[in-house]
Curated annotation (Swiss-Prot):
The lineage of its organism: Eukaryota, Fungi, Dikarya, Ascomycota, Taphrinomycotina. The modification Phosphoserine is found at residue 42. This is NADP-dependent 3-hydroxy acid dehydrogenase. InterPro entries: NAD(P)-bd_dom_sf, Sc_DH/Rdtase_CS, SDR_fam. Homotetramer. It comes from the Eukaryota. It comes from Schizosaccharomyces pombe (strain 972 / ATCC 24843).
Length: 259
């Protein structure tokens, strides 16, 4: 029996990468209701079918763009009754666009990153938090990044968004200490996902170079850490976790084997 059994878990950015892997890791060990939210509805529909065919879970695929801030309250309020009583929110949706230095910054890309990574995460939290306060318990797990702790050239906006996530998470934790609401953050280092393809606007060669001759983490590695955090006893909060592959020591400190 898992401590997650019977819970309703909402994951944003669930169509690929860490979000998708987290859904599978949870489904393997717990009888839960999963709400898989993403912009690519057809993709989360297929994931939902696969999960329900393999595991004892109920899955609701949900079309959601967290950058559409005004739509979020309505989406949460209109959830089907059997999925409305959310117990866990995993704020995973996020992206990086470009590696421009500030002098060359694409402001449209900056607005997209800030809206998605920061305001979207805040809006999701704001929409779900009343459910948790009403029962004095619930889990919010925000997926951050090493970039929120250590900046690098070409990452000014993305690093800023993840720093903002960290401070928001910390403040929320302080605001909820008189409850059983747990506020957690998991910060991955180098993870091989679609993240870099998106960052380089679909240029797969540039994306592949990010991981070239290195041994990055997989989405499953981070999903396992998320599952661990969520399955601790209710009095235990895995507040802030940094996860590196064994050959990484910092944002720009990655050992690469000689070709």
């Amino acid at each position: 029996m898992s401590r997650l059994d019977g819970k309703t878990i909402l994951i944003t950015g669930a169509s690929s990468g860490i979000g998708k892997s987290t859904a599978f890791e949870i489904a393997k060990v717990a009888k839960v209701k999963l709400i898989l939210a993403a912009r690519r509805f057809s993709t989360v529909e297929e994931i939902a079918k696969e999960l329900e065919s393999k595991y004892e879970v109920s899955v609701l695929p949900l079309k959601l763009d967290v950058s559409d801030l005004k739509s979020i309250p309505g989406v949460i309020e209109s959830l089907p009754k059997e999925f409305a009583d959310i117990d866990v929110l995993i704020n995973n949706a996020g992206l990086a666009l470009g590696t421009d230095k500030v002098i060359d910054l694409n402001i449209d890309d900056a607005v997209t990153m800030i809206t998605t990574n920061v305001l979207g995460m805040m809006a999701m939290t704001r929409a779900v938090l009343p459910i948790f306060y009403s029962k004095n318990k619930g889990d919010i797990l925000n997926v951050g990044s090493i970039a929120g702790r250590e900046s690098y050239v070409g990452g000014s906006v993305y690093c800023s968004t993840k720093s903002a996530l960290a401070q928001f998470t910390s403040a929320l934790r302080k605001e909820t200490i008189d409850t059983r609401i747990r506020i957690m953050e998991v910060d991955p280092g180098l993870v091989e996902t679609e993240f870099s393809v998106v960052r380089f606007h679909g240029d797969k060669q540039k994306a592949d170079n990010v991981y070239k001759n290195s041994e990055p983490l997989t989405p499953e590695d981070i999903a396992e850490v998320i599952l661990f955090a969520l399955t601790r006893r209710e009095n235990v909060v895995i507040a802030d976790t940094l996860v590196f592959p064994s050959h990484q020591g910092g944002a720009n400190h990655v050992y690469r084997k000689q070709a």
